Amino acid sequence: MANLRSVFEQLNDVSLRAVIQEEAYRDIKLTIKETKTYNPYAHPVAVADSLEKLGIETNPFAVKAHTHAAAKTIELDMYKIVSFYLPKENPTTFMFMKRSKLQYFRRGPQQKDVFLNAHIEPKDVARYDVDTLFDKNVTPQITTNTAFMGDTLHFLPLTAIERIFKSSPKLQTLYATMVLPPEALHRLHSLHPGIYELEFHQEHFIYKPGGHAGAAYIHKYEQLEWIKVGRFKWADEKGLTHMVTSQILETKGANHLFIFQRGRFLTPELRCFSTETKYVTMPPIFLPKQFNARLPIKKTTAQQLFLYVKSVKNVTERDIWAKMRQLLKTSELQDYNPREVTLLVNYFLLIARLRSETCFDNVLSGGMFKKLFKPFIAWWEIQKHKIFGNEEFEQLMEALEWVDVTLTYPTKTFDNRGWVVKLEARRGYEWFADEMHKPKGPELNLEEKKTDPDAASYEKYLKALSLLQKEPEVMEAKEAEATDEPQRPEVKEEQAEASTSGRAEEIQEDPATKKGKEEPNPNRDLLCPCGLHLKIKNAEFPELPVLDHPDHLTGRKAWFFSKDGKPYSYTGGSHASRGWPNWLEKILAAIEIKEPLPEFNQCLVQQFKLQAAIPFHRDDEPCYPKGHQVLTINHSGECLTQIACQKGKASITMGFGDYYLSPVGFQESHKHAVSNTTGGRVSLTFRCTVQQNKFNDDGSMEALDNLPWKAWIPKLQNLGFQGRQLQYDPNGALISPIEEIRSMPKCKPEGVPEVVYKTLDGLARAPTPYSPNPIRARAYTSDVKNCRIGALLRQQGKEWGCRFDALVEAGKRELAISVIHGAGGSGKSQALQTLIKDNPELDITVVLPTNELRLDWLRKLPKAPQEKFKTFEKALLAPPTPIVIFDDYGKLPAGYVEAFCLYFSTVQLIILTGDCKQSVHHESNENATTSSIEPLVKEASELCRYYINATHRNKKDLANKLGVYSEKTGLTEVTHGTTPIPGLHMLVPSLYKKQAFSEMGHKVSTYAGCQGITAPKIQILLTEETSLCSREVLYTALSRAVHSIHFVNASPNNQAFWKKLECTPYLKAFLSTLREEVAQPIEEKKAEPTPVEPPRTHIAKEDAMVEYENVIEKMPEKHEREIFSEKHGHSNCVQTEDPFIQMFSHQQAKDDTLLWATIEARLVISNPKANWQEYLEKRPVGEVLFESYKRAMHLPKMPIPFEEDLWNSSMHEVQKTYLSKPENMIKNGMARQSPDYDPNVISLFLKSQWVKKMEKLGAIKIKPGQTIASFHQATVMLFGTMARYMRRMREVFQPAHIRINCEMTPEDLSSWAAGEGGHWKFKGPSLANDFTAFDQSQDGAMLQFEILKARHHSIPEDILDAYLTIKTNSKIFLGTLAIMRLTGEGPTFDANTECNIAFTHTKFNIPEGTAQLYAGDDSAIDGLPALRPSFKMIEQKLTLRSKPQVALQQKGDWAEFCGFRITPKGLIKDPKKLHASWMLEKKKGNVKNVLRSYELDLALAYQHKDSLHELLSEEELKYHYETVRSIVKSGGGGVLNTYISKDESLY
């Protein structure tokens, strides 16, 4: 081992070390996996070391606790050991064992084991099932030849073996585990203190596993005899002696596994038990005997004490006591008795005083004569000492004769025979029963099997079990048989009933009764005089489509159809082909569901006139092969069908749905005719110009001797195909299920198991020599090294890439290869999967191009270890097994397989599976070297012995159109549409469309990327890119469907719309191209109220500008007000030299100082884990908020059903709004429209604005601005749709006394508040909330509120998950943001408004019917509601804070809402704020652009004329009048003029 270790240490190559580590890791993983079953517990280090010395592995990462984990582990390990001895097939009897422990014996219900238990102790009542109990006073009979008893036999007397074997003649072998510490024979303390402890009493001793008294065993000392007995003897009534031989199979600590075998066998004469520590006992050197130290002591301790007392001069008793205390650990002191310690000290005190220098002479000194007499002298000295006493040296030697405690005992025989039998045995007459005639176990003879009910039931059980085990395979075989074999005609109900009843008289009917039946037999025979039976059958056929432009013949019209497009000519007519429409396949399918049909590639549809006829003729034109069969269908109407031969004629009337198939040779031996047709009678005649399949009467297919692939039929049958059908592609060419057959040499690589080679050779896929192409391999390694390709490999670092490239460059080798090519669904991987399933121990690595395909393999092989299956990049990071399977290898990068083989020299055999006719890997990076080399499939095709051109996936019609052989019957449904069908797997031509439709919620794959997918139904998106796809790519896409294909061609016709869609490459990814027709709303004309002329008066003219002087005087100098940053300098918010303009802060997006100050003030950086934790912690608060909101908004108690139409309408509204933007704005957002844009990434901008809030005019210090978050456009539109949808739903249930300022004009709000029947009462103070950091404070509680609200609206869960993700994972360039509201999310306004409502109603107890207005973070309530007491309980859990603003609702003090004053006359603008904003625009010279909007705002108050004296204070009137004069002088007044008469002036 030391040499091997030194060799390993000298290995400095990283790849070689990785190989060794990988091999070691596999073993470690298997070991840890096994510990989860037998040793799942956490152990202290010392205990774990003890267990490993006993051969029991311990998982160092285990955390499971147990009161006596070590003892329990040994118990389970004993079960594992005995599991290897128990029979694998036959049942075993388990005694005193719970059923739940059967798993530790690696057994299950398939063995049908028997359990025998008894209630002996009270705890047994809860442990054992009632159906397993036996009478504890009667020894049960064991009916199996093997039994097991767990940890119980040691409590029973030795006679128990006789009773068990005597009562069970079938029993041959009994396995039993016992817990008997052998050291208890010597009253030794536990030899394994970490595993168990011992406590000794006068007649009993106690075994405590793990020192835990709750699981203790109380034993008598005589029970220890079990570990010494090797044979048990007893005599039966006849005097015959029986014997059972016992032997210990394993012993670990106090746990022992015994085997008791009926009969006389050899057993070891000694029983030995191991000890971790050696013990010795001191010889008795004192009298009386009771004063000798007799308990064992550790030999190491004894040696230490002996050396100590002999190394110290004049050692005293106190010295020995001190040394004893030094040597004994504190934890060990409890194991020593003070009396024994005292006796031990006296023993060592005595030997300390004895001389250790020998008293005898040596043999080295003296001359020859002296040496000659020295032995005699020595003898004499010994004899003298015996008489007169020993010298001290001799006394010391005698005192040091320590006795080693070895725990080895001779085996005994327990003889329970009577004294007479024993006496005869001593005289040589000991009789034993003949072992050849002793009772057997379940091995019974034939007669016994017939009479033994247990054996019969057991046989039935095994048979049923085998069927259950094979059920998956049986079901697969049945499905294959159903697809391979033609379906038989259905058995009629009368026949089925007769066959099941078993009474023949029930099917005997009177002819008159048959005639009176309402449902005649649809199968009739046309009997020809020559004896030919032409069976006329009936079926329900689908309606025919309207057929135009017929060919006109005598008495009929005709339409000809053919698959190959060739015309049809015959004597008297010629027809051009009209193709082969799908409805013809449906006509044939109506018959094929009842019986198999041969191939047909032509059909003549004829519509007859009244009494039309076709004379006798044959369909034996030269274009048809000899012996071909013709199918004639009477689709509608009636006719008289006649046949004729040399012996005569026969006729029959055919009606609706009748048809017949002419037998082989009919066209050569018979003629047929049609006459007496009804008007409009339609017939279909199917023929075939190529060789047809032939079927027997029972539906089975006749064997064709001239099949080109006849020799390959056994291989096809192994794949689940019959291989006997003749099938043709659309061009009429015969489809061969086996193609591209090649012959090449075979090789059998070393290290490949025989079962693998035989499997491949049986498939005719024997390995052949292969030398990887180094040029292709270098191309791949170069791309990896230079990070041109790959995802996972790019993260391995430059060093790994260089080493990878160097090893491949230096590699040159030859290995074995087996290439398996076949169509999709041909079963090319099935044999390999079966090989892995049946041989799980094989070292095989499966490399897969995608994770989807890896999951598919795991689904098919759920019991196989997951590490066998790796994606291609991960496979390069760990050494593989000698056999590697590359499934669907065409999707691997070019050069990968070659690089893999050269990189790993341990690979001996590679198996490639794929389809050379399907798409291959495409490298999108044009700079990559691998993008310019050919795919491996071309080279691998030359190493493939044959191609399987057959499929189980596609139905025959679709497969044949693709040129593939299929025996799956039925029709593939093909539909067309302009919109995708939700839920169907969609195939698209490009990657960006895949990303786009994936974002819309579709399950999407590209044409090329769908390889390996099988779906019952698929939909294929057709675009202008479809025509650019190769044949292989289209073949891949079309071959995915099992039952139906839906083609989607969604192309809007509006050119302006197309232009806007095409302005960026990604816009179509998230826009729906459906059209929506919106009805024009019809507004009802309201009756105009009769105006009341107010008294004419004027407002005093005063200059309002002086009111701002106090603010201007207090303003500091510009740079004192600006924000300063050391990196970016001062901000630039105070602009121009005009003091009035300087009152207003101008925030600009380009101001870096202001941007960083805003980010610092408005944003909080967190991480996803903290965000999720906050969300979880505050979910209860969110539930409270939602309940308050639901009650306030009168939402129904139960969730609102989801309305798909309303969702689509909301989506179109959002898209319409987005598309209404100018084209340049859409182009500016190109990056955010890209599917590659990270949906969690947010671009931040500073909002450019003039701060016009009155409280911020002339601020001494400039305040931070407001950020705008730019999200992924698809995210914005998705959640915008969600918000729009919930808004529409909210409007349905929203009470009349609550209004949200959304899509409403000031006039609408005025009418609602103060109009006729207005909701605002003005009967007391009003309340408004002034929030602090409203957006920043919407934390996890508000997020939970939003989730609950959306879930109540039945928003799909995937959208909610996405919303949770974006809220908890949103990140900017500084990191992940905390949960908060961001301007630009999509649902910002609606979410802010609803959070405001929820918070307000949670905080205040607002009476029902109180008028309320909400808009974002603004609100106003017509009243002063009381604070809810419950709000104080959750206030500290909410980040959001609000300061109530109370208005007395009297002159000059009205409720404020969104810059409006809510007055009894309606909503008006705040006069002072309006005046200040207007003067700012005027001084900026921007009057022309804003004049009309300001005049409209002013008109809200101006229209009330002199009534303003009742609403506004004197100061407010001054501002109002000054604004009117300034606007009129600036060229306005057009709107104001509409409120005065002609003879009035504007001011």
Swiss-Prot record:
InterPro entries: (+)RNA_virus_helicase_core_dom, AlkB-like_sf, Alphavirus-like_MT_dom, DNA/RNA_pol_sf, IPNS-like_FE2OG_OXY, Oxoglu/Fe-dep_dioxygenase_dom, P-loop_NTPase, RNA-dep_RNA_pol_alsuvir. Keywords: ATP-binding, Helicase, Hydrolase, Multifunctional enzyme, Nucleotide-binding, Nucleotidyltransferase, RNA-directed RNA polymerase, Transferase, Viral RNA replication. SUPFAM superfamilies: Clavaminate synthase-like, DNA/RNA polymerases, P-loop containing nucleoside triphosphate hydrolases. GO terms for molecular function: ATP binding; ATP hydrolysis activity; mRNA methyltransferase activity; RNA binding; RNA helicase activity; RNA-directed RNA polymerase activity. Residues 949-1082 form the (+)RNA virus helicase C-terminal domain. GO terms for biological process: DNA-templated transcription; mRNA modification; RNA processing; viral RNA genome replication. Residues 59-227 form the Alphavirus-like MT domain. Residues 793-948 form the (+)RNA virus helicase ATP-binding domain. Residues 477-495, 503-522 have a biased composition (Basic and acidic residues). It catalyses: RNA(n) + a ribonucleoside 5'-triphosphate = RNA(n+1) + diphosphate; ATP + H2O = ADP + phosphate + H(+). This is RNA replication protein. Belongs to the potexvirus/carlavirus RNA replication protein family. It comes from the Viruses. ATP binds at G822, A823, G824, G825, S826, G827, K828, S829. RNA replication. The central part of this protein possibly functions as an ATP-binding helicase. Its EC number is 2.7.7.48, 3.6.4.13. Residues 1324-1431 form the RdRp catalytic domain. Residues 477-523 are annotated as: Disordered. Residues 599-690 form the Fe2OG dioxygenase domain.
